[in-house]
């Protein structure tokens, strides 16, 4: 039989398993691939294939991540699983593996543990839109009341971090039994129920094309007789010739008109997400625009200087700092295409930050940058990356 061509007919969603160490994230990941493989919708990946994930470097940070893929009736999923807790922290903060939703794995035998809490907080801070809970190892708990107590505890914990704890689907099962092929309510059935819940509850991501136009400006040129051209890769949305666009960040916002879009020396009617283009701007002087600003649909994004961030500070081994830093530390924050100096304030009760820590901090930049929740940045000192972060909340 000929190999089937991979048909992109189903919507694509990125998900991942999160939760405390040894609660069964990797076993569950393997079990999902096994159950889906039985239906001809995945390639089975054994536990040790997933657990021995190779190291990858993302923005200078070493992260181990395993990627598996599978399909349900409705969707195609790319699923990430990380071997170690530090890998999760780095992954979620750098956005190395984008998550449209997560499966929170909690051992019914232990209940929520410190990393359960930390992963929920991280998911909230970095803007993972939805979570589904898999209450694992139910074969180790005989008492039905105890199971209900653990479920209540998980729901309350989710609610305390602003997830809708009462509405989130909680599926009870045993990843190990499913992996062993046991056709029982806690085995294979539980995996099928889990995937139904993921299909139903985790929203389909909005495609970049359908979002408001935004393009980080990488370069500015003057073309004699035609005006100023800014170049960059369109991050999202569409820009059409004749439309108004705003130049945002660093200086005061200016609204102008796009009078031309060029790609590979050809003139186009429009540019769209993913295209590397030159955009011709009406009546804009070359010195009015600079790298680090963005071109965007008017009123779709605002410039800000003050925000809360969730960040990870590199270890010495990763090429980061060798020493801790304190409040009022002034590094550069690299957003999209440029560095902006900022001052950071540590949370109350935190004296200093050591290399390898992850921390919530308040940052004030010396110049405004077009930003919104979820925007990633690097923390740099003299061109060397010392950390990574994500905007958790815009303050001003």
Curated annotation (Swiss-Prot):
Region (G4): 136-139
Region annotated G5, chain positions: 174-176
Region (G2): 60-64
Pfam family, one: GTP_EFTU_D2
Alphabetically ordered keywords of this record: Cytoplasm, Elongation factor, GTP-binding, Hydrolase, Magnesium, Metal-binding, Nucleotide-binding, Protein biosynthesis
Catalyzed chemical reaction(s): GTP + H2O = GDP + phosphate + H(+)
InterPro entries: EF-Tu_GTP-bd, EF-Tu_GTPase, EFTu-like_2, EFTU_2, G_TR_CS, P-loop_NTPase, Small_GTP-bd, T_Tr_GTP-bd_dom
Gene Ontology terms: cellular component: cytosol
Similarity annotation: Belongs to the TRAFAC class translation factor GTPase superfamily. Classic translation factor GTPase family. EF-Tu/EF-1A subfamily.
Official protein name in the record: Elongation factor Tu
Species in which this protein is naturally found: Magnetococcus marinus (strain ATCC BAA-1437 / JCM 17883 / MC-1)
Lineage, uppermost ranks: Bacteria, Pseudomonadati, Pseudomonadota, Alphaproteobacteria, Magnetococcales
């Amino acid at each position: 039989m000929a190999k089937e061509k991979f048909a992109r007919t189903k919507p694509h969603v990125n998900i991942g398993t999160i939760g405390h160490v040894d609660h069964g994230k990797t076993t569950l990941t393997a079990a999902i691939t096994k159950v889906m493989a039985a239906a001809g919708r995945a390639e089975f990946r054994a536990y040790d294939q997933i657990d021995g994930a190779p190291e990858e470097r993302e923005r200078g940070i070493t992260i181990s991540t395993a990627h598996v893929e599978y399909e349900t009736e409705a969707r195609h999923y790319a699923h990430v699983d990380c071997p170690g807790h530090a890998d999760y922290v780095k992954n979620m903060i750098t956005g190395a593996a984008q998550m449209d939703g997560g499966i929170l794995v909690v051992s019914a035998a232990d209940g929520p543990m410190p990393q359960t809490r930390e992963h929920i907080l991280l998911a909230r801070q970095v803007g993972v839109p939805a979570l589904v809970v898999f209450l694992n190892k139910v074969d180790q708990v005989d008492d039905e009341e105890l199971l209900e107590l653990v479920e209540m505890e998980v729901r309350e914990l989710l609610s305390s971090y602003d997830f809708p704890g009462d509405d989130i689907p909680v599926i009870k099962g045993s990843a190990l039994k499913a992996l062993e092929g046991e056709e029982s309510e806690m085995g294979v059935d539980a995996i099928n129920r889990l995937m139904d819940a993921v299909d139903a509850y985790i929203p389909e991501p909005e495609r970049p094309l359908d979002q408001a136009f935004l393009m980080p400006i990488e370069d500015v040129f003057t073309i004699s007789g035609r005006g100023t051209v800014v170049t960059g890769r369109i991050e999202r949305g569409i820009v059409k010739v004749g439309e108004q666009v705003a130049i945002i960040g660093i200086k005061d916002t200016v609204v102008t008109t796009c009078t031309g879009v060029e790609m590979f020396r050809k003139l186009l009617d429009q540019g769209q997400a993913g295209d590397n283009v030159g955009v011709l701007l009406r009546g804009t002087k070359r010195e009015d625009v600079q790298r680090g600003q963005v071109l965007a649909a008017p009123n779709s994004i605002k410039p800000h200087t003050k925000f809360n961030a969730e960040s990870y500070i590199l270890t010495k081994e990763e090429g980061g700092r060798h020493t801790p830093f304190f409040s009022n530390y002034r590094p550069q924050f690299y957003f999209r295409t440029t560095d902006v100096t900022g001052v950071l304030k540590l949370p109350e009760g935190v004296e200093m930050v050591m290399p390898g820590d992850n921390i919530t901090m308040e940052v004030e930049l010396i110049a405004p940058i077009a930003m919104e929740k979820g925007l990633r940045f690097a923390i740099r000192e003299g061109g060397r990356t010392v950390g990574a972060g994500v905007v958790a909340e815009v303050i001003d």
